[in-house]
A protein has these predicted regions:
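Short S/T/G/P-rich N-terminal loop/turn motif that feeds into the first structured element of a domain
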Residues: 1-61, 70-78, 94-110
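Short, conserved catalytic or adaptor-binding loops enriched in Gly and charged residues
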Residues: 89-92
Length: 110
């Protein structure tokens, strides 16, 4: 995936986090190209704030995208190109996945 920020820079809360946890199937089959495109496209969407993504050696991946509001998340989920990627993911790229949406009420760090 094209270099998402390792530690996302977000505005002061509240905002929303979409947490996508997945385990990949074997082989690329166009995955990296599509993942790069989805990050590029998400960054262009109204309400998009940032994205962070990590993948472990065991294939477990956690991608967190941050959004200004629920309407922006819904619009992204319904985006035609994103829906195409979702279908391909369910059919080809993911052996397992879970999506969670959370309201960030507080954040802090160094």
């Amino acid at each position: 995936m094209s270099s998402p920020d390792l530690l996302a820079k977000t505005p002061p809360p509240p905002y929303y986090a979409v947490i996508f946890t997945s385990r990949r199937t074997q082989g690329d089959r166009g995955y990296m190209r599509m993942a790069d495109r989805m990050v590029e496209l998400a960054r262009q969407q109204p309400g998009f704030l940032a994205v962070e993504s990590v993948r472990g050696a065991d294939g477990l991946c956690i991608t967190v995208s941050y959004w200004a509001d629920k309407g922006s998340i819904t619009a992204w989920k319904r985006h035609v190109e994103h829906q195409t990627a979702q279908c391909a993911g369910q059919r080809t790229w993911y052996s397992d996945y879970q999506v969670r949406v959370a309201l960030v009420e507080r954040d802090y760090g160094k």
